[in-house]
Amino acid sequence: MDPAHHIKDTSAELLSQQDFSILQSRLLEFLASQEARETVTASKELTLLRQGIRQLKEKVSKMEPEEMTVKEKKSIIEILKARIALKKAFLKMALSESNDTVVKKEDVRESPVDTFMENAT
């Protein structure tokens, strides 16, 4: 095969620290707007975050493992670990908020299905 045949501009396909920095800042913006209960802003940030993740996944899927540098592989692992940690923290926060909001049975209206099921037993 002709070696010149394999030469291509891969700068757009290579992972860069900027790719990860952008995702991290978008994630932080989303979490901040979520915490502040700014629904519209959180929705926009989540959309941008999803787009960024999709673009990063496309870049990674097009790369051969041997094309990735050790630094890129470590960066991907760190991002995945951070995502897992953030998901755990978010779920823990949501769980603690749901435990703080205790609903009394008399405050909840029974649905017709619940009434039917109680009467059937």
Curated annotation (Swiss-Prot):
Transmembrane segments: none
Biased composition (Basic and acidic residues): 102-112
Region listing for Disordered, in residue ranges: 101-121
GO cellular component terms given for this protein: mediator complex; nucleus
A single GO molecular function term of this UniProt record: transcription coactivator activity
Domain of life, per lineage: Eukaryota
Protein name per UniProt: Uncharacterized protein C24C9.04
